[in-house]
Amino acid sequence: MCPVENKWLKVGQKGAGPGARSSHAMTVVGNKVYCFGGELKPTIHIDNDLYVFDLETQEWSIAPATGEAPFPCFGVSMVTIGSTIYVYGGRDDKRRYNGLHSYDTETNEWKLLAPVEEGLPGRSYHSMAGDDRKVYVFGGVTAKGRVNTLHAYDVVDQKWVEYPAAGEACKGRGAPGLVVVEGRIWVLFGFDGNELGDIHCFDLASEQWKAVETTGDVPAARSVFPAVSYGKYIVIYGGEEEPHELMHMGAGKMSGEVYQLDTETLVWERIVCGNEEEKPSQRGWCAFTKAVKDGEEGLLVHGGNSPTNERLDDLVFWGFSHLNVN
């Protein structure tokens, strides 16, 4: 297929930011990026500060906070609905798991919405996505192993909703891509002891699962990678294509490629993102979110683990304006 050209932008950073880390999470409220959790060394948590990056001034700060914050953790996920951030899961170095917390960006208050004892089994390296009412949680690693369950937290009714199980065809997995597109939840790839290359889709209206076969420039199996939606398209970047023999303690084979999937035609296309010297380091285990930078919507990525097992501290942006869309 004919590759589409686009380029990465390295975003300048000022102020006291999160620094080098991996297994953390990011989300956006307005022109502010919020970052939480992570590890600098494998399986050792860092802090529970909530870092804020202003996309206009390009400066980091630490959010003022009251209330009951999540404890320091890694393998955590977060999404935004309205002006509220929802943070779920993640574990510390003693394998304690966080429940579901919210952070109100207008009042700067943390709240514990659902402790682990009253909600889902504690987990890390799960994936989250959201719409205007629900926070969706799929998969992850619990104390009993990797799971393939799908739940949602209804922010209006303030309760968990359990959906039908994904079935044996969709193995329990950690760190898949999870994206909501036009009333359907897409589960892409992940890790079950091996990197997975399958895709599954859940229709929210019919509550039916189905396995999805795709064509085109199909990406290699992978996990711990950014995945976001853009209209009817899913965009993925990077990830770990092969695990290290030491698993989490080492860095496996990392990717630096960008792909787009048309969810109607089910055709993948690999995107050429400038010259090799213009690309950011290959990585996985990074924080990511959709964001608008200088009027353009795109993928914003912070940190992650590099092929040398060194944690990264850069902030890079990839705009959607040159995607091959129709």
From Swiss-Prot:
Which EC numbers characterise this protein's activity in its record?
4.8.1.5
Keywords assigned: Iron, Kelch repeat, Lyase, Metal-binding, Repeat
Tissue occurrence: Mainly expressed in seedlings, and, to a lower extent, in roots and leaves, but barely in seeds.
- What InterPro entries is this protein classified in? Kelch-typ_b-propeller
Binding-site positions, Fe(2+): E240, H248
Top-level taxon in the UniProt lineage: Eukaryota
The UniProt transmembrane annotation reads none
What activity regulation does UniProt give? Answer: The presence of Fe(2+) supports lyase activity in a dose-dependent manner with both benzylglucosinolate and 2-propenylglucosinolate as substrates. More active at pH 7.4 than at pH 6.
UniProt catalytic activity: a (Z)-N-(sulfonatooxy)alkanimidothioate = a nitrile + sulfur + sulfate; (Z)-phenyl-N-(sulfonatooxy)methanimidothioate = phenylacetonitrile + sulfur + sulfate; (Z)-N-(sulfonatooxy)prop-2-enimidothioate = but-3-enenitrile + sulfur + sulfate; (Z)-(indol-3-yl)-N-(sulfonatooxy)methanimidothioate = (indol-3-yl)acetonitrile + sulfur + sulfate
Enzyme category, top tier: lyase
Q: What is this protein called?
A: Thiohydroximate-O-sulfate sulfur/sulfate-lyase (nitrile-forming) NSP5
